[in-house]
């Protein structure tokens, strides 16, 4: 069985990490707001880095959802990649819609976010803290794929 991974917050970090997971053959759904969801559906996603990675996902080739219930209801893993200010709102959506067995991983700036997520759940869940030790730049140009670029050479596995 392939784990269904939901990227809960399809901004620069979410799109980059999700794109890398999709490149590795993982089943990924992006939970995105309207503007990003529309850009991904219309123009696709381009994942690049300083080491020469340059991959385009064609329009319509990625699973993109704007409805949290649809995105989260069958998640095995939820990667929370929203800005810290939106942590509790996203935790509420995960609590409401994701299966209780789903593993939740915070990939956010700030040392308290994983514990804030765990505290927001009505019943205990597995919540882990992760980190993204590199910068990602998101570029959006009309008629081009939404581009996420790893903008430094710090090592990562992916």
Model-predicted segments: where are they?
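ADP-ribose/adenylate-binding Rossmann-like module
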Residues: 94-112
């Amino acid at each position: 069985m392939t784990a269904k991974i939901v990227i809960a917050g399809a901004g620069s970090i979410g799109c980059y990490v999700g794109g890398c997971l999709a490149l590795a053959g993982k089943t990924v759904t992006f939970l995105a707001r309207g503007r990003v969801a529309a850009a991904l559906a219309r123009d696709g996603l381009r994942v690049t880095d300083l080491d020469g990675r340059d991959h385009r996902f064609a329009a319509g080739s990625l699973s993109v959802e704007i409805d949290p219930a649809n995105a989260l209801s069958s998640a095995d893993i939820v990667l929370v990649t929203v800005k810290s200010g939106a942590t509790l709102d996203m935790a509420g959506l995960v609590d409401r819609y994701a299966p209780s067995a789903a593993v939740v991983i915070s990939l956010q700036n700030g040392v308290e976010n994983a514990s804030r997520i765990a505290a927001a759940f009505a019943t205990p869940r597995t919540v882990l803290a992760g980190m993204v030790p590199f910068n990602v730049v998101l570029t959006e140009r009309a008629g081009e794929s939404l581009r996420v670029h790893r903008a430094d050479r710090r090592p990562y596995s992916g």
